[in-house]
């Protein structure tokens, strides 16, 4: 494999010295870029874009042509696993993802099998291989999956949800059924991420988008427990390097110590927590990723630079152990030039902290 020209992202995750703070953006390949919209139109629809390795690679690389980002992230969707389990994923315009056959009872859970990462999900692995080839060693490639809990919310609710009543009903009325589903999902995520690593992903991330809707006790039992299982099951060395794993629970600031105790290399932070507090709590154990509110990218350039400076100051002089990111995905109507201001500000303003 080609030697990495810029490995700052991997080094920062492993708390090795870097000369500036590396940065990437959640959803950096996406609808805020006109070139993405053009490629998506060429593909026909979102899943066709995901399933075409050349086009998935093209959109993965688009933000890297505009901005000096320190990592690329696989262009895919967290719902590939439930789709491959036969739930019938489709997208309603303006409404997000839906499933034709949601999970309603134990019989539904019993019916689903573990998808083969080089079978039903081979299109994802083909995209990973294509992206690695097209990156030519410029920056590392991040693979990812949704967390078992987050995948289960979509599978039981039948799509997005505001109140999560269906999955919470299952959690409280039929906990054994939900545990059965989560266990299958954890096994599937382990196979899926390990296949991404074998195909060329140099780091992996688990997105627990909806862990923050749970009580502390339920979070430990129904979300974190299964992410811990995933961390234990992952390949951690490949191509002669450690493969870092990042866990990100949105609205998970209450549980940072528990997340850090899973054995992950890094913990993702959303914008609802002060990074200085997070560092004081878990910075001795793990690297931190985050955590600017994506809405700040609507502001004037000076305000964006100011916010970047505040977060860098909050993390302080550690010299490493921080990957700068947004606290969640970039919004689809952010001007691309503002994203450029953000990336440049991280590089410029972080250098004094790495002397």
Curated annotation (Swiss-Prot):
Single GO biological process annotation from the record: protoporphyrinogen IX biosynthetic process from glutamate
InterPro entries: UROD/MetE-like_sf (IPR038071), Uroporphyrinogen_deCO2ase_HemE (IPR006361), Uroporphyrinogen_deCOase (IPR000257)
Subunit structure: Homodimer.
The name this protein goes by in its record: Uroporphyrinogen decarboxylase
Annotated HAMAP family: URO_D
EC number: 4.1.1.37
Gene Ontology terms: cellular component: cytosol
Gene Ontology MF, one: uroporphyrinogen decarboxylase activity
Gene designation per UniProt: hemE
Pfam families attached to this UniProt entry: URO-D
């Amino acid at each position: 494999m080609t030697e990495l020209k810029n490995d700052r992202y991997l080094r920062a995750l492993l708390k090795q010295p870097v000369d500036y703070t590396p940065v990437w953006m959640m959803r950096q390949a996406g609808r805020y870029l006109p070139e993405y919209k053009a490629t998506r139109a060429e593909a026909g629809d979102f899943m066709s874009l995901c399933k075409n390795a050349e086009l998935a690679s093209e959109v993965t690389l688009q933000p890297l042509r505009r901005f000096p980002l320190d990592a690329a992230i696989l262009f895919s969707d967290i719902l590939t696993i439930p789709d491959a389990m036969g739930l019938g994923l489709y997208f309603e315009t303006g409404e997000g993802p839906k499933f034709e056959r949601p999970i309603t009872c134990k019989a539904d859970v019993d019916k689903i099998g573990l998808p083969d990462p080089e079978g039903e999900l081979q299109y994802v692995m083909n995209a990973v291989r294509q992206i690695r080839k097209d990156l030519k060693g410029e920056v590392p490639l991040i693979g990812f999956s949704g967390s078992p809990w987050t995948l289960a919310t979509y599978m039981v609710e039948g799509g997005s949800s505001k109140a999560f009543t269906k999955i919470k009903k299952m959690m409280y009325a039929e906990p054994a059924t939900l545990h059965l589903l989560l266990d299958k999902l954890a096994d599937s995520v382990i196979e899926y991420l390990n296949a991404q690593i074998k195909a060329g992903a140099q780091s992996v991330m688990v997105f627990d988008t909806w862990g923050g809707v749970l009580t502390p006790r339920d979070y430990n039992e129904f979300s974190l427990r299964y992410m811990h299982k995933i961390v234990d099951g992952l390949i951690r060395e490949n191509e002669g390097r450690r493969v870092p794993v990042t866990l990100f629970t949105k609205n998970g600031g209450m549980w940072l110590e528990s997340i850090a105790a899973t054995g992950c290399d890094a913990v993702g932070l959303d914008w609802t927590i002060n990074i200085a507090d997070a560092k004081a709590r878990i910075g001795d154990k793990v690297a931190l990723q985050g955590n600017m509110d994506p809405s700040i990218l609507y502001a004037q350039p000076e305000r964006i630079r100011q916010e970047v400076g505040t977060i860098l100051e909050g993390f302080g002089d550690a010299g490493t152990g921080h990957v700068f990111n947004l606290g969640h995905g970039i919004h689809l109507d952010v001007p691309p030039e503002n994203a450029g201001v953000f990336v440049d500000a991280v590089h410029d303003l972080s250098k004094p902290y790495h002397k």
